[in-house]
Amino acid sequence: MAKKGNRIQVILECTEHKATGLAGTSRHITTKNRKNTPERIELKKYNSVLKKYTIHKEIK
C-alpha cells in the first residue's frame, strides 16, 4: 500500500477582515509539508476587499 503523503492542502483566512465586520471573508488555499511545519502557518496575502496585504492564518 502507498504511504500517506506529507504535503496537505490548508486554508488561510484573513484575521483583519473578521475584525472590520465587512461582508464576506478573504480565504486562500495553499499547501504545506506536514513533516517540516507541523504548527499552523501565517502568511501575508493580498485581501481584495481591504485592498492591502494582511496576515492570513491557517484554519481547521
Curated annotation (Swiss-Prot):
Keyword entries, A-Z: Ribonucleoprotein, Ribosomal protein
InterPro entries in UniProt: Ribosomal_bL33 (IPR001705), Ribosomal_bL33_sf (IPR038584), Ribosomal_zn-bd (IPR011332)
Biological process terms in GO annotation: translation
Source superkingdom: Bacteria
One GO location term (cellular component): cytoplasm
Pfam families xrefs: Ribosomal_L33 (PF00471)
Molecular function per GO: structural constituent of ribosome
PANTHER family xrefs: 50S RIBOSOMAL PROTEIN L33, CHLOROPLASTIC, LARGE RIBOSOMAL SUBUNIT PROTEIN BL33C
Entry-linked HAMAP family: Ribosomal_bL33
Protein family (similarity comment): Belongs to the bacterial ribosomal protein bL33 family.
Name under which the protein is recorded: Large ribosomal subunit protein bL33
Organism encoding this protein: Cytophaga hutchinsonii (strain ATCC 33406 / DSM 1761 / CIP 103989 / NBRC 15051 / NCIMB 9469 / D465)
The organism's taxonomic lineage, starting at the top: Bacteria, Pseudomonadati, Bacteroidota, Cytophagia, Cytophagales
